[in-house]
């Protein structure tokens, strides 16, 4: 089958290196150094300007290792025709990547069900679609930082907080029909019918708020601020909309409901040694990330696209921002991430695996749940992947680090195994097996300790104990063995998504999270993360949370 397929990465390699991908001889030191990069030339000019203005030397690529001894590679963002410079895929230089994380950190999901019970049972108030709509009008005034109950309160400028709002969703079609459309995330409109039915059944007659606090607030403070900011404005809006006395005992019940009882944080609290609160990156489980990304409701007939959109999202979020900056403070982690979402390489390997699974087992999620399936699929895809690196020297240069190659071969193997079994734990086993096979073939994978979690992971894939094993959907960067090994976390999230899209599931872990991000008012297009990263690299992405309104005039 391998000989009959058109390799998806060949065109990208040809354009990157301007030589035939199978060519085994090349040249060095003749490409112009850093001047071959338009972005580096721009950096140099800005570095001179900064140094002149501040009186302290700034960017100078002639310091340190000479850049550009070989091709300073451009990258084709997979699923797009866009080639970009590597520097533009660093999250500091990419507004789309920043907004990706902003949109997660500033979101909290809060139920209205407990609050409605308090209103009806404790206060004797009537809750109707009309009162819910009135409350939603009130809370959309208040959530950006406006006053509703107290006088002489300072307020935020709506031009600075225009990205802050509240919408609701429910599995009850009759109730949804009564909610004003501007406040509603309509499950029937946003999801294909088979997914909408699953989600509505799971959510039932409950009603939930998708709260977006202002980007500028979560950036200035932290993720743990999100639920507190949300709860304060929700509480004040409830008092105003339902004409309560602010000091009565039920106010405490509303505060508890809005802060604790029906609150879904998108990130869990981290241990003291990592010192982060809720809604911070290290606490975002893989299953939540798979649900946040919305590719599955648009591209559900292309399971590889769906799984790899999650891989790309996780590689950027977990590798570039969490491990690359929160945890290590480094710059080079970007290259680990780009390997998984550029040049159609992982796409090629994973489509090969999917086709193999379909040919061998007659479809996705049809293979037996046993070790023979894991051994078969992971071995086949790993050997195919390693063969490509041997056959195409430019592919080897593209993924110049052994740990990059290990991550990509294992990601394709893990996703393919998850496709076969429809089970994320099986996919994890496929990943671990691929790493061990790869090390057997090449003697090493990458930098020292890269495969630490892979060597011990096989022993606890099916051990469901608090610090040794969890269902893959519930694992995340906070899982002990995954604390500091780059080139793993995003791929694990993709393996989770691969299992659930193979089964035809509408969500991977939490239907509330899936629906909360099916929201067209969000600035980031969650159905197309790789396309958005490309827009950010081209400087075509429009972010939220900007401060131009309060800058000095003329600046």
Swiss-Prot record:
One of the record's GO cellular component terms: cytoplasm
Q: In which pathway does it act?
A: One-carbon metabolism; methyl-coenzyme M reduction; methane from methyl-coenzyme M: step 1/1
Q: What domain of life does the native source organism fall in?
A: Archaea
Chief location bin: cytoplasm
Key words, A-Z = Cytoplasm, Metal-binding, Methanogenesis, Methylation, Nickel, Transferase
- The residues listed in the UniProt record as binding coenzyme B, with positions renumbered to this chain, are 228, 259-260, 273
Subunit record text: MCR is a hexamer of two alpha, two beta, and two gamma chains, forming a dimer of heterotrimers.
Instruction: Please report which protein family the annotation says this sequence is part of.
Output: Belongs to the methyl-coenzyme M reductase alpha subunit family.
Protein name per Swiss-Prot or TrEMBL: Methyl-coenzyme M reductase subunit alpha
Q: Which organism's genome codes for this protein?
A: Methanothermus fervidus
Whichever gene encodes this chain, its name is mcrA
């Amino acid at each position: 089958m391998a000989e009959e397929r058109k390799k998806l990465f060949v065109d990208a390699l040809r354009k990157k290196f301007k030589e035939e991908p199978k060519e085994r001889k090349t040249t060095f030191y003749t490409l112009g150094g850093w001047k071959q990069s338009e972005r580096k030339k721009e950096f140099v000019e800005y570095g001179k300007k900064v140094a002149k203005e501040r009186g302290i030397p700034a960017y100078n690529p002639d310091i340190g290792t000479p850049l550009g001894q070989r091709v300073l590679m451009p990258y084709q963002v997979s699923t797009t025709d866009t080639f970009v410079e590597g520097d533009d895929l660093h999250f500091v230089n990419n507004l789309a990547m920043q907004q990706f994380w902003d949109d997660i950190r500033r979101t909290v999901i809060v139920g209205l069900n407990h609050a409605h019970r308090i209103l009806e049972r404790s206060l004797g108030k009537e809750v109707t679609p009309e009162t819910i709509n009135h409350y939603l009008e009130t809370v959309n005034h208040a959530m950006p930082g406006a006053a509703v109950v107290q006088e002489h309160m300072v307020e935020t400028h709506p031009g600075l907080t225009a990205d802050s709002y509240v919408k609701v969703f429910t599995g009850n079609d009759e109730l949804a029909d009564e909610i004003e459309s501007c406040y509603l995330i309509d499950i029937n409109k946003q999801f294909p019918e088979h997914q909408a039915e699953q989600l509505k059944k799971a959510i039932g007659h409950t009603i939930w708020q998708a709260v977006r606090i202002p980007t500028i607030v979560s950036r200035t403070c932290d993720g743990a601020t999100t639920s507190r900011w949300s709860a304060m404005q929700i509480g004040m809006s409830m008092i105003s909309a339902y004409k309560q006395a602010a000091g009565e005992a039920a106010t405490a019940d509303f505060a508890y409901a809005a802060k604790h009882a029906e609150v879904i944080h998108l990130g869990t609290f981290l241990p003291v040694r990592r010192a982060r609160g809720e809604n911070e990156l290290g606490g975002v489980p893989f299953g939540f990330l798979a649900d946040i990304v919305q590719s599955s409701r648009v591209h559900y007939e292309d399971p590889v696209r769906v799984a790899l959109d999650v891989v790309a999202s996780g590689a950027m979020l977990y590798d570039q921002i969490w491990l690359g900056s929160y945890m290590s403070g480094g710059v080079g982690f970007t290259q680990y991430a780009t390997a998984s979402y550029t040049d159609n390489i992982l796409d090629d390997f994973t489509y090969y695996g999917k086709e193999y699974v379909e040919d061998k087992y007659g479809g996705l999620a049809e293979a037996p749940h046993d070790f023979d399936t894991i051994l078969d699929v992971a071995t086949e895809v790993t050997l195919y992947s390693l063969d490509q690196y041997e056959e195409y020297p430019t592919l080897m240069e593209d993924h110049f680090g052994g740990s990059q190659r290990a991550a990509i071969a294992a990601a394709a193997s893990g996703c393919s195994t998850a496709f076969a079994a429809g089970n994320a734990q099986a996919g994890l086993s496929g990943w671990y097996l691929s790493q061990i096979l790869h090390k057997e073939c090449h003697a090493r994978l990458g930098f020292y300790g890269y495969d630490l979690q892979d060597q011990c992971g096989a022993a606890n894939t099916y051990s469901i104990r608090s610090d040794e094993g969890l269902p893959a959907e519930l694992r995340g960067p906070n899982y002990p063995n995954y604390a500091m090994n780059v080139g793993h976390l995003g791929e694990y999230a993709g393996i989770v998504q691969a299992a659930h899209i193979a089964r035809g599931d509408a969500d991977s872990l939490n239907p509330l999270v899936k629906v909360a991000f099916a929201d067209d008012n969000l600035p980031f297009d969650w159905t197309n993360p790789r396309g958005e990263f490309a827009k950010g690299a081209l400087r075509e992405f429009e972010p939220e949370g900007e401060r131009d309104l309060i800058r000095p005039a003329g600046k």
